[in-house]
Amino acid sequence: MTGLIEGFLGKRSDGKKSRTPAAWDRWQSITGFILACFILCHMVFTSTILLGKDAFNAVVGFAEAKFLFGEATWWITNVIAAVIFVVFVTHAFLAMRKFPANYRQYLMFRGHKDRMKHLDTTLWWFQFLTGFALFFAASAHLIDIIFGGHINADKSAVAFHKLEIFYFALLVFMVVHASVGMYRLYVKWVSIDGVNKHEMFAKRNKAKTVVFVIYGILAVIALIADFVWISH
C-alpha cells in the first residue's frame, strides 16, 4: 500500500522523492512495447486469410505447436491470450495514473491541448481516447479468445459476420494507440542527438514517419483482410 501511495504522490513518507513513479513508468513502457509488438504480429496473423483459409489454419497450427505434437494443441493459443490479457491489464493500470482524474482535469487538459496546438500533445490525446476504448473492447476480445476454445478460419469468419463493426473499430483503436505509443517510447527512451534542435526534430520526425508507415501499411492490409473475412 505504501508503494501504491508513493506511486501516485511521487514522495515517500519522509518527504524525499520516491523512485516508485519511475519504476512504474519503466514497467508501463515495457508492457506497452510488448503489446505494440503483439499488435503487429496479430495484424500479420489475421491477414493470412488473404492467402486462403488453409494458410490461416496452417499459421494457427504452427502457433499451437502442431509440428511438435502432430496435432494442434488448441489450449496454447488460449494460454498466450491469457498472458497477453495480464500484460494488457497491467499496462492499463499503470497508464491510468496519467489520465485525467476527474471531469475538471479533463476540461483543463483539453483546453491546454487546444491552446498549444502541439502535435505530440494531440497524439497523446488520441492515445488517451483509444486507450479508454481499448480497455473495454480489447478486454472483451481477449476474454473471448481465452474461453473460446479452438481457433480456425470457419469459426473466425462467423465471428466477423456477427461483429464486423466491432472488429473494424478494434482495428482502428489498436493501430492508433500502438503507433502513437511506439513513437512516444522512442522519444522517451532513445537518445535523439543532433548538432542543433532542427536536426533533433528532423530525427524525431523521421522516427515518427517510420513508425506510422509500418503500422499504417499493416493496418491497410489487415483492413482488406477484414473484408475478406466478412465475405467468407
Task: Identify what each model region corresponds to.
Residues 1-232:
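Membrane-embedded alpha-helical bundles that constitute the cytochrome b-like, heme-associated redox core
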